[in-house]
């Protein structure tokens, strides 16, 4: 992969066309930027909001059917690995080299990581405590408090995780369509890597966002504790599944915990479910995985697949119970 500087006086579009004309076999596009999908407002108030994960029946602790997940990959911002909820987790954080600008903040990455693998005895018990999580910090701080990841760094991050034989990657980020990203997503799918992507928080009437809108990803939207769609979630025919994403209890960046809202925090529920499903069959294709996970959804919208909830709301209780039944009994 090559990153080029645009000559002075030439537009980005002209530069892209010129490079593409030099080699018609190359995939050429702009170095777009992508952002995490969290909302500063919790979107939840009152007693019981922190227990929003219970609407999908996610078991507490190491439930038998969900106790042996496959290794998980995460591409996100920096992570506070010293947070009490992550202190004893099987977490590895990789920082990309040769990155420009200031380091990204730890708020988003820490929250997503803790939601996935936070210690079961902490204030932020993860969905899969004890699971191995390999996280790549692909973001940099831009414009004050905004964290962004370039296509160049996203591709490098996905390559790194592929080298580590990760079979499911959480992508709680969105941005514009990009030919290089699309090619990378297709290559990952061809390698048997399942990409779980946040649907986006740009609003119900927004245009599709990526990578969620690509066919080779699982696009996850968010719902609140009443199973209502998150008010800012992007809608579209590419939405695959819904999960809790409003008032989700997870780690704060430095210490303690707080409620978080956004499709960023719905995606980890599905990532965790995928990790469990592929633990017995790491070579499961995306097509087979999607057919399998549909068996563990509750249709809460229009009959069948719809642009608001996809196939429906993840039912973690039935997923874990199924996994428990599939395991051979002890002698």
Predicted regions mapped to residue ranges:
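Hydrolase catalytic cores
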Residues: 115-116, 136-138, 167, 245-326
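Aromatic/histidine-rich interaction motifs
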Residues: 1-12
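Catalytic-core environment of secreted peptidases
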Residues: 75, 81-84, 91-93, 222-264, ...
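Subtilisin-like serine protease catalytic core
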Residues: 59-72, 78-92, 100-150, 214-216, ...
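Protease zymogen maturation seam
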Residues: 10-85, 308, 330
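Loop/turn elements at helix/coil->beta-strand transitions in domains of secreted/extracellular proteins
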Residues: 24-26, 68-71, 130-133, 163-169, ...
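Substrate-binding/access-modulating region of protease and related hydrolase catalytic domains
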Residues: 138-215, 228-229, 235, 253-267, ...
